[in-house]
Amino acid sequence: MRSIIADSKRLVVKVGSSLVTNDGKGLDHAAIGRWAAQIAALRAQGKEVVLVSSGAIAEGMQRLGWSKRPREIDELQAAAAVGQMGLAQVYESRFTEHGIRTAQILLTHADLADRERYLNARSTLLTLLRLGVVPIINENDTVVTDEIKFGDNDTLGALVANLIEGDALIILTDQSGLFTADPRKDPNATLVGEANAGAPELEAMAGGAGSSLGRGGMLTKILAAKRAAHSGANTVIASGREADVLVRLAAGEAIGTQLIARTARMAARKQWMADHLQVRGHVVIDAGAVEKLTAGGKSLLPIGVIDVQGAFARGEVIACVGPDGREVARGLTNYSSAETKLIHRKPSGEIETVLGYMLEPELIHRDNLVLV
């Protein structure tokens, strides 16, 4: 089996907290130097690289003398502010040794949820790559709140891969890849060498939380691969402890778990809707509506809605959940939650009678709907 990275030109590399902070003992300058050297080698092969690096909060904790990750958001933000300084300085110093300029970019979910800011971020990143700069991206932990957090840098890495239309996402972690079961508990667990990024059984294999330093467990990495596949990007999950792992992947060596994007690439606007707009509520739809959305490419009509949950306004994103509780689609609603509660289970011809007006015959038009 040949590594999918060998034929990939534009890469997003995500490095976890434990790999850049030596399991929380402060920034590991030697390890960061090795990442810089490997990325320089990839650049010499003509590959473009964007680096998503965790470590700001962990470095801030070390500088502040904290042994446990705080739970209060203001303390997390303070740690991020302290740690981000050191993280940026070390990366700049190490890449300069190879004659490479770096750029620091801090993002929040709100930056990508706004279409204009999303396009500006994309333009900036593509310009930096054209100029030969390595962008180093992290979540802007000093200003985020629970409502606008990405949640983890695995998710951020996938969204960046979509943003720049990357060929592949490489998630480097302290684990060898995805196993069929937890290898710490099951001696028969085996490494998954390659799989479809959208395969539902992967999520069951990946259950469990991450380390106390970071926020991402294996499940977040599987979900990140699924997101990256929206833009056609493949994903590799591999151990960052492997010597020269990036160089070896680029040379064609299969390391870790390869998750292949086998779904059709989404149109740019639908990709943005699926990945960057926050879901404000959801509707439960019947089996017939599920069939029409997934197989027929139809719009969602009010008559197919069984239940309405959450508070949302017209034009916001809502999720469409089947009778089994599984999300099948999401899209921009033509009616608020209050209006939807009045018209659900009713044919479109009765909307005006119930509400006194009809904005649209569909709850979600197919042009504003994305299958997930």
From Swiss-Prot:
It catalyses: L-glutamate + ATP = L-glutamyl 5-phosphate + ADP. Gene3D superfamilies: Acetylglutamate kinase-like, PUA domain. One of its GO terms (biological process) is L-proline biosynthetic process. CDD domains: AAK_G5K_ProB, PUA_G5K. Pathway: Amino-acid biosynthesis; L-proline biosynthesis; L-glutamate 5-semialdehyde from L-glutamate: step 1/2. ATP binds at K14, T173, D174. Its main location: cytoplasm. It comes from the Bacteria. Residues 280-358 form the PUA domain. It is an enzyme of class 2 (transferase). The keyword Transferase applies. SUPFAM superfamilies: Carbamate kinase-like (SSF53633), PUA domain-like (SSF88697). Its EC number is 2.7.2.11. InterPro entries: AceGlu_kinase-like_sf, Asp/Glu/Uridylate_kinase, G5K_ProB, Glu/AcGlu_kinase, Glu_5kinase, Glu_5kinase/COase_Synthase, Glutamate_5-kinase_CS, PUA. GO terms for molecular function: ATP binding; glutamate 5-kinase activity; RNA binding. Substrate binds at S54, D141, N153. It is found in: Cytoplasm. Keywords: Amino-acid biosynthesis, ATP-binding, Cytoplasm, Kinase, Nucleotide-binding, Proline biosynthesis, Transferase. GO terms for cellular component: cytosol. Pfam families: AA_kinase, PUA. The keyword Plastid does not apply. NCBIfam families: proB. Belongs to the glutamate 5-kinase family. Catalyzes the transfer of a phosphate group to glutamate to form L-glutamate 5-phosphate. This is Glutamate 5-kinase. It comes from Burkholderia cenocepacia (strain HI2424).
